Regions:
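Cytochrome P450
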Residues: 1-428
Length: 428
């Protein structure tokens, strides 16, 4: 079994500002900090560097409470992501927050509109659609593993883990191949605007640039598809209605941004984290090779372990008590999903990477009404890429340091250099 540094709680930083510092998320040990908070104050009042306070929720029970009661905890009033600075907390300056407060994107809607919008989009992510898509995903996975083996050495993040989900979502959306690199670059910038490798100027400027670029692209493409709709996801956006009213251009563009950006994060980062842990824990790799049935439970442990979406922001719509604390209407609450997924009261040996973990009620895909629309697709991709990996890869090892993305929203990877060896082929 593999254990990480978060299992040892020592020398903890005292400054709660670390909770939203993108560079601490990249290089620090947040799991140690969260473990202490779960013990001492799982509902804890915290100040941002720009003076706005919020309730920090770190226990599984409290995070799940937020998901199970979308009426009391609004995703729309102030958006669903904790702003990094005062500018990003100002809807006059932040395009993403302004659109969020309009309910332009699916995850930033409250009932009943959230359910209506979700039903308008979900066809491409239902079991029947995924069954039809599976041969494409399987062939893609085999090709990516084959290309990796042909190189011998590669950057697993950008050569495999990022290409798998981006190619799949671009296929579902029927994005022209010549535009993939542009959209991938803008998605990285929008998801991690504070990372110097992705950002371009200030955090606010980088985020606004990315959103504007992808929105404009999706809106223009949707106008073309509306005239002659097909079976692709852009055509769905172009022709969808909510309560009989067509989506606005902003709603089409912002949901397109969601599919392009968020559609990549879970698989890319869970897969990289999972492979990294299998390298560090050869007993788990041997266990998987001896029992391929573990491919059914492995995807959820990959997601639990990394928790690609670290948190969601909610706004209290009424006065209430939560975890012994008095919450007032209008208060912000930040539910730390990554902390909930290591809660010692829910998961046996939570700091142990266990590909056969059962049960595994992690919240990495959200829960209830806000269960990730692409959750089943992410599981399919992880299962298929690992099937191809087991079939074709004999050995994999790190050849350098793993580099993490500087983001307080997504627990991501930038680079993971590896060396791989192909399995010997037996010729009858």
């Amino acid at each position: 079994m593999s254990r990480d540094a978060g299992s040892e709680v020592a020398a903890l930083p005292q400054d709660d500002h670390d909770l939203i510092d993108p560079h601490f998320h990249a290089d620090g040990d947040l799991h140690a900090l969260w473990a202490r908070h779960r013990r001492e104050a799982p509902v804890r009042w915290t100040q941002t560097p720009y003076g706005r306070g919020y309730w920090s929720l770190t226990s599984y029970e409290r995070v799940r409470d937020v998901y199970l009661n979308p009426v009391a905890f609004s995703s729309q009033r102030n958006g669903a992501t904790l702003p990094l600075n005062a500018q990003m907390a100002d809807p006059e300056q932040s395009q993403t927050l302004r659109l969020a407060m309009k309910g332009a994107m699916l995850p930033q809607n409250d009932p009943p509109r959230h359910g209506i919008m979700r039903r308008a989009f979900q066809r491409h992510f239902m079991p029947k659609a995924l069954q039809d898509l599976e041969p494409f995903v399987a062939n893609l996975a085999t090709d990516l593993i084959g290309e990796m083996l042909d190189k011998g050495e590669c950057d697993f993040v950008n050569d495999v883990a990022a290409r798998l989900p981006s190619t799949v979502i671009f296929e579902i959306m029927q994005i022209p191949r010549e535009d993939w690199d542009f959209l991938f670059e803008m998605a990285n910038r929008g998801s991690a605007p504070a990372d110097p490798d992705y950002g371009n100027g200030s955090v606010l400027e980088s985020r606004n640039q990315a959103v504007k670029a992808i929105l404009g692209y999706i809106i223009d493409l949707a106008k073309c598809r509306r005239a002659s709709p097909g079976d692709d996801l852009i055509s769905v956006l172009a022709t969808a209605t909510v309560d009989g009213v067509p989506l606005t251009d902003e709603e089409i563009g912002y949901n397109g941004f969601m599919f392009v950006a968020a559609g990549q994060e879970t698989t890319r980062n869970s897969l990289t984290a999972g492979i990294a842990q299998l390298i560090k824990a050869p007993d788990q790799m041997q266990r998987l090779r001896a029992n391929p049935d573990l491919l059914q439970t492995l995807p959820d442990e990959f997601v639990r372990w990394r928790s690609p979406l670290t948190h969601v922001l909610r706004t209290a719509t009424q006065d209430m008590e939560l975890g012994g604390q008095r919450i007032r209407e209008g208060d912000w609450l930040v539910a730390w999903i990554a902390s909930a997924n290591r809660d010692e009261t829910v998961f046996a040996d939570p700091f142990t990477f266990d590909i056969g973990r059962k049960p595994n009620p992690h919240l990495g895909f959200g829960a209830a009404d806000h269960f990730c629309l692409g959750g089943l697709l992410a599981r399919l991709q992880l299962r298929r890429i690992m099937t191809a990996f087991l079939e074709h890869v004999e050995d994999i090892e790190l050849t350098g340091a793993i580099e993490n993305v500087a983001s307080h929203q997504f627990s991501g990877f930038k680079r993971m250099p590896v060396r791989v060896k192909a399995r010997s082929r037996v010729i009858a």
